[in-house]
Amino acid sequence: MPFTSEIISIILLAIGLSMDGFSVSLGLGMQQLRLKRIAYIGLTIGFLHMLMPLAGMLLGQVISEQIGQWTSFAGGVLLFLIGAHMFFSAFRLTEGFRWQPVGVGLWIIAFSVSLDSFTVGLGLGISGVQIFVTLFAFGIVSCFLTWLGMLIGRKVYRFLGVYSELLGGSILCGFGIFILFS
């Protein structure tokens, strides 16, 4: 994949992965958090959106040496399945328990919205993507979208909440299909 199209794909993937954090931050924004707390939450989520896929990529590279030619196919299928899960989970009828974004609760929130980044990192590690560029994009985009979500969350959570998860899942599915057929 040429470098420019890889960058565009990585940015789109970063946006897709960050939609979980964006959705959660829309809800957190309704708690009237101070700007300092909003900044800290965004940085924490951005950090874990870099750390989790790094762990997945490293494991994915080890696995790719073992399974050879099937690596791109496996990575594409994995990304598609994650996106499909994210897309369909947007249709849940019940609202789950929400942790408060302080101390351990903040790390649990950040970990839960970053967990899908680990499995995406696994798929990307198998496909041999540029690690530094990918991690940087994941961290920056997730941090920015978390901040943005908290700042606008007070006014539009009920309108965008479900749609942001649908969009994120669609982007992941599309990226998985792109890898499968390229």
Swiss-Prot record:
Coiled coil (UniProt feature): none
Transmembrane stretches, start-end: 7-27, 38-58, 71-91, 106-126, 131-151, 159-179
Top-rank taxon: Bacteria
One Pfam family cited in the UniProt record for this chain: Mntp
InterPro entries for the chain: Mntp/YtaF, Put_MntP
GO cellular component: plasma membrane
GO MF term list: manganese ion transmembrane transporter activity
Keywords: Cell membrane, Ion transport, Manganese, Membrane, Transmembrane, Transmembrane helix, Transport
Record localization: Cell membrane
Membrane topology: Multi-pass membrane protein
Family: Belongs to the MntP (TC 9.B.29) family.
Record function comment: Probably functions as a manganese efflux pump.
HAMAP family cross-referenced by the UniProt entry: MntP_pump
Name of the protein in its database record: Putative manganese efflux pump MntP
Lineage: Bacteria, Bacillati, Bacillota, Bacilli, Bacillales
